[in-house]
């Protein structure tokens, strides 16, 4: 039986005064692309990230270091309000560093920050559409008939009503928690496959895109934990005639967003077409199971683009083509991407490569 939170028992303890001290929850990406966290007490309200200490953890237990040299260091990178504890308590997104001061192998933020600094005059904006699938604690899709299947896809996308959407209360809790925390969440919707949902984060400039998406993911898995529900970011969690899960990446630069920007968008698409394989390499594991040319995807083996074409690698929204400026949508990234890798390679390809 899955463990369930006793929120009614916890509530009076969370209401107790803390004095001047606060709790800071350090959050980091582990060696397998998952999320970990642990808490420390800080003597006063944090107003400057520089006042937070560099901490450490046992990297041999997170697939980030060998046992004989297991200390990995956490350097604070971004702060968000803590929706679980409230008050002045905070969530601290941290980068991971090895004992010799080099970035850990899963610290993709380090490189991305350098890339975004080089491109800052172009003011790159991103908006990520994070799809995910919910499962019961026993591993069955949440809300599906035990040992069976729901009706075929059709009524579930942006659906309303019993039997069409599942776990809306969990999704609403996540949405409100993101707003409280300061995450730039811009929307939610039920997706094409039952028990699949999407939230959108952005627009965010530069390195903040990865920061906001990772923390939004953390809030989602923490809240789902309270519901005794599992969150899957696998790009094809269920085989058969079901949609996969992606993380469509909307991208623009200052020049793209200004009148006449369509020409810049077309130039960017041409550059992206020449590095298709390099992008696919960092666009998520098992993405070949999703990018089949079916279920609103382009084929993983070929680059394509088009206006309003959801079967293309790159989609230009119809309203963007009509007005002559705006943004493009890269539909190739899978739901399990590291956003730092995706946003940095897009900037490298379109802005920094000769």
Swiss-Prot record:
Keywords: ATP-binding, Cytoplasm, Ligase, Nucleotide-binding. Its EC number is 6.3.1.2. It is found in: Cytoplasm. One of its GO terms (cellular component) is cytoplasm. It comes from the Eukaryota. Transmembrane segments: none annotated. GO terms for molecular function: ATP binding; glutamine synthetase activity. Signal peptide: none annotated. Residues 22-101 form the GS beta-grasp domain. GO terms for biological process: glutamine biosynthetic process. It catalyses: L-glutamate + NH4(+) + ATP = L-glutamine + ADP + phosphate + H(+). Residues 108-354 form the GS catalytic domain. It is an enzyme of class 6 (ligase). Homooctamer. Belongs to the glutamine synthetase family. This is Glutamine synthetase. It comes from Hebeloma cylindrosporum. The lineage of its organism: Eukaryota, Fungi, Dikarya, Basidiomycota, Agaricomycotina. The gene is GLN1.
């Amino acid at each position: 039986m899955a463990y369930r939170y006793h929120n009614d028992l916890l509530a009076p303890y969370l209401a107790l005064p803390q004095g001047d001290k606060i709790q800071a929850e350090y959050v980091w990406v582990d060696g397998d692309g998952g999320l970990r966290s642990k808490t420390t007490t800080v003597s006063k309200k944090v107003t400057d990230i520089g006042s937070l200490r560099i901490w450490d953890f046992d990297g041999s237990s997170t697939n980030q270091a060998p046992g004989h040299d297991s200390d990995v260091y956490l350097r604070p990178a971004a702060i968000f309000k803590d929706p679980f504890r409230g008050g002045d308590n905070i969530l601290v997104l941290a980068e991971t560093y090895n004992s010799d001061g080099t970035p850990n192998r899963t610290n993709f933020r380090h490189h991305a920050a350098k890339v975004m600094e080089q491109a800052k005059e172009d003011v790159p904006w991103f908006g990520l559409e994070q799809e995910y699938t919910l499962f019961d604690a026993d591993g069955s899709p949440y809300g599906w008939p035990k040992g069976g299947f729901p009706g075929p896809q059709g009524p579930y996308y942006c659906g309303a009503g019993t039997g069409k959407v599942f776990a809306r209360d969990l999704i609403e809790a996540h949405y409100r928690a993101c707003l409280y925390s300061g995450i730039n969440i811009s929307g939610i919707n039920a997706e094409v496959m039952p028990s699949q949902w999407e939230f959108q984060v952005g627009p965010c400039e530069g390195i903040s895109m990865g920061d906001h998406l990772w923390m939004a993911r953390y809030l989602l898995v923490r809240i789902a934990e309270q519901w005794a529900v599992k969150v899957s970011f696998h790009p094809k969690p269920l085989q058969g005639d079901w949609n996969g899960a992606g993380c469509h990446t909307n991208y623009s630069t200052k020049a793209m967003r200004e009148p006449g920007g369509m020409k810049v968008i077309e130039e960017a698409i041409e550059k992206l077409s020449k590095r298709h394989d390099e992008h696919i390499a960092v666009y998520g594991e098992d993405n070949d199971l999703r990018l089949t040319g079916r279920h609103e995807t382009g084929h993983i083996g070929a680059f394509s683009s088009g206006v309003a074409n959801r079967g293309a690698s790159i989609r230009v929204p119809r309203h963007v083509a009509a007005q002559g400026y705006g943004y493009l949508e890269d539909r190739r990234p899978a739901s399990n991407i590291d956003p730092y890798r995706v946003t940095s390679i897009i900037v490298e390809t379109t802005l920094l490569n000769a």
